[in-house]
From Swiss-Prot:
GO terms for molecular function: cutinase activity. Catalyzes the hydrolysis of complex carboxylic polyesters found in the cell wall of plants. Degrades cutin, a macromolecule that forms the structure of the plant cuticle. Allows pathogenic fungi to penetrate through the cuticular barrier into the host plant during the initial stage of fungal infection. Keywords: Disulfide bond, Hydrolase, Secreted, Serine esterase, Signal, Virulence. One of its GO terms (cellular component) is extracellular region. The active site is at residues 136, 191, 204. SUPFAM superfamilies: alpha/beta-Hydrolases. GO terms for biological process: carbohydrate catabolic process. InterPro entries: AB_hydrolase_fold (IPR029058), Cutinase/axe (IPR000675), CUTINASE_1 (IPR043580), CUTINASE_2 (IPR043579), Cutinase_monf (IPR011150). This is Cutinase. It comes from Fusarium solani subsp. cucurbitae. SMART domains: Cutinase. It is found in: Secreted. Belongs to the cutinase family. PROSITE patterns: CUTINASE_1, CUTINASE_2.
Length: 230
């Protein structure tokens, strides 16, 4: 039965490929890097005030995918290129389609990978304000990682944005163990994954406008509430 369910899921999802919008992919390329490792490569002696950790959607390229570069660009406009570090989740997070069918919407290895980035941010730059985000499987990954974090680190995450949240129904539009007022979930009308399905319909591929405007605006507002407007 489990094999049948997984096979059915993979067939349904594969029939809806590509899992990203070509226009969003083009915009991501035009904005520049779809891979960012500022936290991993950064020097603790020159920490940014803000660290953004983001998980891409299934099958997306780089570690920022299609939506991450837009958010990153807006954050850098607000805080300066030296004022914010951008870090995508790579490594053990393979963003494979099959992992969507796992109980938490992604793999245990992926959750450990993102947890490690939050922990590294806390160790390397203990005074930095953390923000986070994720799209599709990456939204489930961000939620699971934040849920599992030590409360002292979780409390440092000023805001989190989730697009096409595959665990939206199960988690009632929230991230467990994390304040609702620090969470912004973007679920388009007709995006079936937000209502408990794993079928990718057209609305699931249309979060570009949110990544360019409301999502980074929310994160910027939350950071400034913690650090001030400077």
């Amino acid at each position: 039965m489990k094999f049948f369910a997984l096979t059915t899921f993979l067939a349904a999802t594969a029939s809806a490929l590509p899992t990203s919008n070509p226009a969003q992919e083009l915009e991501a390329r035009q904005l520049g890097r779809t891979t960012r490792d500022d936290l991993i490569n950064g020097n603790s002696a020159s920490c940014a005030d803000v660290i953004f950790i983001y998980a891409r959607g299934s099958t997306e390229t780089g570690n920022l995918g299609t939506l991450g570069p837009s958010i990153a660009s807006n954050l850098e406009s607000a805080f300066g290129t030296d004022g914010v570090w951008i870090q995508g989740v790579g490594g053990a997070y393979r963003a494979t389609l099959g992992d969507n069918a796992l109980p938490r919407g992604t793999s245990s290895a992926a959750i450990r990978e993102m947890l490690g980035l939050f922990q590294q941010a806390n160790t390397k730059c203990p005074d930095a304000t953390l923000i986070a985000g994720g799209y599709s499987q990456g939204a489930a990954l961000a939620a699971a990682s934040i849920e599992d974090l030590d409360s002292a680190i979780r409390d440092k995450i000023a805001g989190t944005v989730l697009f096409g949240y595959t665990k939206n129904l199960q988690n009632r539009g929230r991230i467990p163990n994390y304040p609702a007022d620090r969470t912004k979930v973007f679920c388009n009308v007709g995006d079936l994954v937000c209502t408990g399905s794993l079928i990718v319909a057209a609305p699931h591929l249309a979060y570009g406008p949110d990544a360019r405007g409301p999502a980074p605006e929310f994160l910027i507002e939350k950071v400034r509430a913690v650090r001030g407007s400077a």
